[in-house]
């Protein structure tokens, strides 16, 4: 088994084997209008959509990255083995993506990017077009200052975890009780509050589900 890691400081992604040994492949994530990509979220795409094109070649993205620079980038080894291709740039809108998820709804696939700065979850179709209404992924009961910080799709549910926005862009306020988790449907409808603010959570970012 291999593990892909998104490297925020170098705007790259590196590959490791199951023993933690780095492999020779290093993928560069291109900058956007707001500067370096600084990838934080990475998802595997096992389908034939989310196409990227460069140098006269097209192919489905095997991995898709989101980052603090507000970009989405897709990597297809048949298009460019060592570089991802920018497919969306939200830098002019101030987007700061701190997490990324991929889920299916019916026969269609969608990406979900947690925009910590603008306090939204941006939803994209399989052609990287932003979709979804203004009321998607909204919890009116959250206290002011909370924003989506991480995201994970599990089955037909999208789990969004929140943190309080700090003074520095993309950095959450630390401390116990500063985190919250909501559960949404893949269309962005709120299903339930899983963990309320003021509980045991520090700002949560990752989630894993045991078999």
Q: What are these model-predicted stretches?
A:
Residues 1-3, 31-62, 69-71, 89-111, ...:
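Beta-rich, blade/repeat-based domains predominating
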Residues 5-28:
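Beta-propeller domains
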Residues 10, 20-22, 79, 118, ...:
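Short coil turn/linker residues within repeat-based beta-strand modules
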Residues 11-14, 72, 119-121, 181:
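Structural signal for beta-propeller blades
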Residues 16-18, 75, 124, 184:
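Hydrophobic/aromatic beta-strand positions that recur at structurally equivalent sites within the blades
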Residues 23-33, 81-91, 130-142, 189-199:
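A short beta-strand motif characteristic of beta-propeller blades
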Residues 124, 176-187:
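Beta-propeller blade signature
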């Amino acid at each position: 088994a291999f593990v892909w890691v998104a490297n925020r400081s170098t705007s790259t992604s590196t590959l490791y084997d199951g023993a933690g040994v780095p492999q020779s492949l290093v993928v560069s994530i291109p900058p956007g209008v707001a500067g370096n990509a600084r990838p934080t979220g990475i998802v595997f795409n096992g389908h034939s959509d989310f196409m990227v094109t460069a140098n006269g070649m097209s192919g489905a993205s095997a991995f898709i990255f989101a980052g603090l620079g507000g970009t989405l980038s897709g990597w297809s080894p048949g298009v460019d083995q060592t570089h991802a291709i920018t497919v969306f740039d939200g830098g002019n809108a101030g987007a700061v993506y701190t997490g990324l998820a991929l889920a299916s709804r019916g026969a269609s696939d969608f990406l979900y990017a947690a925009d910590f700065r603008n306090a939204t979850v941006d939803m994209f179709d399989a052609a990287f077009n932003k979709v979804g209404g203004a009321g998607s992924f909204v919890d009116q009961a959250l206290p002011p200052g909370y924003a989506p910080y991480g995201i994970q799709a599990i089955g037909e549910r999208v789990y969004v975890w929140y943190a309080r926005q700090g003074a520095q862009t993309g950095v959450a306020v630390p401390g116990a009780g500063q985190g919250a988790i909501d559960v949404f449907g893949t269309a962005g409808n709120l299903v339930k509050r899983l963990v309320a603010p003021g509980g045991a959570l520090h700002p949560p970012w990752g989630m894993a589900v045991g078999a």
